[in-house]
């Protein structure tokens, strides 16, 4: 991303879908779960692309269970997928591949939660608590290269879901898209 400019066509996914969740290594990008025209409740499919060249995605792996609207995290080796309407956290080793395996559980079932990571820890923040459908302010984390249940980290400055998140080696930002009343708010954590 060294220059400014408009986007260009990279390729196509293996299926028409929305509400999938993404994570990446330095060389590969992944899109897991999401709704398809034949299933509005999610899917188990995961597409993969190589960043180094344009081209269509390939079917790469299978989630343990049907998911949509989940938060993700990754480092250079593992990609994690959590939420999507359940407490299940699952992960994949991005190279060489294989299907997702069980990592542990979050404290409650979330959907539309947000995920981010440092090289060592994966975080989930906010979300819609299922089945109550109430906005969450929870922040939980896992140690990416181990397995186990998530650990309480703290709280977002405001409850919400369906937003965006991003992080680097030292900081993470959560933006809650759906909150009531609507606010202009970012939550900052030191990771």
Roles of regions detected by a PLM:
Residues 1, 26-41, 51, 75-85, ...:
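Glycine-centered tight turns/hairpins at beta-strand boundaries that repeat
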Residues 7, 17, 41-45, 57, ...:
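A detector of repeated loop/turn-to-beta-strand junctions in beta-rich toroidal repeat architectures
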Residues 8-12, 58-62, 100-105, 151-155:
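A short beta-strand motif characteristic of beta-propeller blades
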Residues 18-22, 68-72, 111-115, 161-165:
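Beta-propeller and closely related beta-sheet repeat lectin domains
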Residues 48-50, 91, 141:
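Conserved blade-register residue in beta-propeller folds
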Residues 189-191:
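Conserved small/polar residues in nucleotide/adenosyl-binding loops
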